[in-house]
């Protein structure tokens, strides 16, 4: 019997049921008033949870029964480009058809456009399972943020024309941001957008590179709309459709995620429409897209980690050496235990992150539809916006680095067989490698998160969790996390007092790691408080991270500039 990737992973359901999504769902369902107009809308929070549980079980069944068995063939066949036309692998085409038939291509879109109106949290759980089945498919299924961006920032006419097509699976999307000379530095984008007044029409001209699913029917394009500008203030966001003037020059021959075409595009006077306001393409709309992309890739990475870990665990039980299964050897089982605990911590962080993203989006939506937004509404949107802005890069950094480590360990546990294509371990390793690069490298996630860390944005959340009614072992573990938090706070003050840009940049990674370790320690304790069976995992996570916290603290507060002063001499060796 095939696996159900939701029913066989109790941790996803545990997070769904214990996150505290009451306010998220209530606001998204307009105090459940949508039930008057849509028969499938929930009438209460319990009804909503039951609906999410059922749809996640359906996704889990599709992943286990259909998508996962095709993954090896998809990886082998890959996408191909012939004469400018991109063709997905046969298995990818079947996967997309299955997901469309299950009405899963407009998960977050409002019901009036044919969507499920599900929160980001539930959608991310789906993307995690899809990624566990086939990481490359997530790069197609997970691009639903394209439609969500049009929903949030487009005109009603644009919503009416585009969103029902996305929800029905008739249109797919891509975000065309990166250019040959503008990778992470999107302020350097040069693709031109010019407005023809006679035709009342925008046109796009230029090149884009490394565009995931660039062969899509609908593209969101970052382009320079203001003549003579060189920075982000001259960029706007446009939507265009695939046509004869939009050429796929080639697709990249990649290490992994072969089922997802990564395209080089040439725009030759492609008709386009402005999305939102001019000049806000980078500062407002791309930042929103990137926040969504961070969450999506975190889910993708977590799915790969789950797949790699399960595969390694299965092999360790089956493979015998020296007269016993290798799972019996401490060097093997300790690796598997450590990875499992880290996956649980990463999942706790990811879904705490999506909860804050959901609340930020809910308040943003409330403000946009309010005749006169109150000061309290704006305060709530700002507060959740700040926490989401720190949590999303921390989650991406943690989940993607973890995926690479778990996939690496999976091959190690397989030994020489893990290096062979006969086993999926090497595919997980190849697929994991891109996750901490695209949609912002881990180093850029540290840059994105460090401002919030220095401002102690997450302190109220940490304080709230530190004051939960822990007893016995959990109280002792909570005290250890509290001590780690004190070290973190002193490290932040030390770096702030140095007032040295180079030192600040050098220590950003360590501060991000400390923040993540402390926050995940509290999250693991909160989970253990709800389920006593999770005490052992919380204990292992906290005992493993305490020495790392201490090490980072000692390095940061040493004030040692030798790594800066001696860098040229070391690099010259």
Stretches with model-predicted labels:
Residues 243-244, 254, 261-293, 310-327, ...:
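A glycine-rich, basic-preceded beta-loop-alpha segment at the flavin cofactor/substrate interface
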Residues 201, 205-246:
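A short core secondary-structure module
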Residues 344-396, 492-506, 525-529:
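C-terminal helix-coil-helix/basic helical segment that borders enzyme active sites and/or dimer interfaces
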Residues 2-39, 145, 406, 416-479, ...:
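Glycine-rich phosphate/cofactor-binding loops in nucleotide/flavin-utilizing enzymes
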Residues 384-417:
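Charged, glycine-rich active-site and insertion segments that engage polyanionic ligands
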Residues 1-82, 86:
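Extended, charge-enriched "interface" segments that sit outside catalytic cores
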Residues 456, 468-573:
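C-terminal amphipathic alpha-helical interaction region
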Residues 60-61, 90-164, 168, 212-214, ...:
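Internal helix-loop-helix
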């Amino acid at each position: 019997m095939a696996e159900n990737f939701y029913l066989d992973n109790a941790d996803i359901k545990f997070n769904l049921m214990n996150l505290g999504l009451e306010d998220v769902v209530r606001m998204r369902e307009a105090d459940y008033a949508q039930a008057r107009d849509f028969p499938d809308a929930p009438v209460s929070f319990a009804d909503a949870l039951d609906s999410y549980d059922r749809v996640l079980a359906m996704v889990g069944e599709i992943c286990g029964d259909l998508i996962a068995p095709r993954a090896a063939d998809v990886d082998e066949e890959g996408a191909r480009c012939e004469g400018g036309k991109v063709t997905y692998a046969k298995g990818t085409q079947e996967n997309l058809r299955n997901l469309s038939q299950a009405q899963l291509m407009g998960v977050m879109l409002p019901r009036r456009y044919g969507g499920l109106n599900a929160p980001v949290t539930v959608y991310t759980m789906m993307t995690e399972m899809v990624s566990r089945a086939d990481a490359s498919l997530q790069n197609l299924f997970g691009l639903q943020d394209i439609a969500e961006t049009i929903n949030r920032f487009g005109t009603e006419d644009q919503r009416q024309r585009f969103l029902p097509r996305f929800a029905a699976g008739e249109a797919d999307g891509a975000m065309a941001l990166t250019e040959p000379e503008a990778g992470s530095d999107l302020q350097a984008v040069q693709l031109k957008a010019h407005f023809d007044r006679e035709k009342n029409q925008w046109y796009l001209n230029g090149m884009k590179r490394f565009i995931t699913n660039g062969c899509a029917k609908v593209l969101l394009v970052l382009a320079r709309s203001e003549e003579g500008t060189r920075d982000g203030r001259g960029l706007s966001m446009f939507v265009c459709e695939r046509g004869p003037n939009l050429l796929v020059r080639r697709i990249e021959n990649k290490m992994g995620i072969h089922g997802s075409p990564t395209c080089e595009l040439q725009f030759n006077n492609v008709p386009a429409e402005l999305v939102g306001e001019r000049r806000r393409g980078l500062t407002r709309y791309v930042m929103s897209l990137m926040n969504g992309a961070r969450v999506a890739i975190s889910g993708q990475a977590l799915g790969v980690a789950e797949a790699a870990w399960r595969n390694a665990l299965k092999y360790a039980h089956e493979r015998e050496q020296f007269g016993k299964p290798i799972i019996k050897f401490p060097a093997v089982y300790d690796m598997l235990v450590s990875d499992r605990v880290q996956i649980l911590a990463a999942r706790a962080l990811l879904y705490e992150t999506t909860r804050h993203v959901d609340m930020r989006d809910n308040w943003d939506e409330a403000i946009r539809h309010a005749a006169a937004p109150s000061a309290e509404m704006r305060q709530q949107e700002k507060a959740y916006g700040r926490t989401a802005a720190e949590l999303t890069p921390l989650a991406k950094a943690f989940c993607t680095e973890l995926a690479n480590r778990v996939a690496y360990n999976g091959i190690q546990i397989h030994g020489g067989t893990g290096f062979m294509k006969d086993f999926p371990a090497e595919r997980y390793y190849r697929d994991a490698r891109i996750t901490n690069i695209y949609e912002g490298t881990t180093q850029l996630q540290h840059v994105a998160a460090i401002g919030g860390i220095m401002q102690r944005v997450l302190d109220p959340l940490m304080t709230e969790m530190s004051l939960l009614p822990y007893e016995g072992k959990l109280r002792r573990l909570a005290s250890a996390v509290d001590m780690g938090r004190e070290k973190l706070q002193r490290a932040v003050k030390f770096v702030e007092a140095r007032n040295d840009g180079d030192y600040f940049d050098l220590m950003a990674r360590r501060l991000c790691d400390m923040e993540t370790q402390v926050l995940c320690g509290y999250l693991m304790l909160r989970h253990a408080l709800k389920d006593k069976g999770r005490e052992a995992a919380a204990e292992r996570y906290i005992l493993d991270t305490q020495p790392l916290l201490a090490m980072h603290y000692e390095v940061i507060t040493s004030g040692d500039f030798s790594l800066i002063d001696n860098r040229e001499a070391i690099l010259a060796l």
